[in-house]
Regions:
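Membrane-helix interface segments in multi-pass membrane proteins
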Residues: 23-71, 105-129, 167-203
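Membrane-interface extramembranous regions at the lipid-water interface
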Residues: 1-32, 70-110, 124-173, 199-222
Length: 222
């Protein structure tokens, strides 16, 4: 028994998720570089400070552009991967639907002026992306059981639980940080936001680990 379409699909999905991870790292670095540029010293060495500030902003812009390119490339890779894999398992068809719905929500949120509505649309986009991930894992687990690879299936169950848990924690932290503004609460808000990013990073690592093992499993049987 072989699943050539799923093998191609998972390989592309795995590559896409690595690109997304690199993209998020670029975004974080852009934020750090931007903050450093803003904090550049002033009066005593104005010329040097101005150069440092300008260089920092240029660096931040380059990193943001890299983030955008990586995310677009990752979406295309994911889209192709889902389309490939759906021919071997129905769960990937559902995952594809949520992937498209998520990008639609993201696209609309960019053009919405109302901050509240934009936040809701972004949250719906994040939820769609999470559901897409869940169905990818479910599809791989089903294939793993058909191949008698209970180890992969069990790992998938563990990753599913972790993803759901981290999403709940991330949502709560993001929700709390949204309503904390000004003074001391600004510091608390920043800490909570960083904690949310850390939780999301852990989720990505676990998901990548699962995809890596799944990719190897499918390559062996080809």
């Amino acid at each position: 028994m072989s699943f050539p379409n799923a093998a191609k699909g998972i390989k592309r999905i795995y590559t896409a998720e690595i690109l997304k991870l690199i993209g998020y790292i670029c975004l974080i670095l852009a934020a750090i570089v931007g903050v450093v540029a803003l904090a550049a010293p002033g009066d005593e060495a104005y010329g040097a400070a101005e150069t440092l500030s300008l260089g920092g902003f240029i660096g931040a812009i380059v990193l943001v552009v890299a983030f955008a390119i990586l995310m677009i490339t990752a979406f295309i890779m994911n889209l192709i991967g889902y389309i490939n894999a759906r021919n071997d398992n129905e769960n990937f068809k559902t995952a594809l639907v949520f992937l498209i719905v998520g990008i639609v929500f993201t696209g609309i949120s960019v053009f919405v002026i109302n901050n509240g509505l934009s936040s809701i649309l972004y949250s719906l986009s994040t939820l769609s992306e999470t559901l897409s991930t869940i169905f990818v894992i479910a599809g791989v687990m089903q294939i793993a059981r058909q191949l008698g690879r209970e180890d992969i299936s069990k790992k998938g169950t563990t990753v599913l639980k972790l993803i759901i848990t981290t999403e709940v924690i991330s949502f709560i932290l993001s929700f709390i940080s949204t309503f904390l503004r000004g003074g001391t609460t600004e510091i608390v808000s920043t800490v909570l936001l960083l904690a949310s990013l850390l939780v999301t990073f852990i989720k990505y690592i676990m998901y990548l680990s699962f995809l890596s093992k799944s990719k190897k499993m499918l390559q062996v049987i080809q």
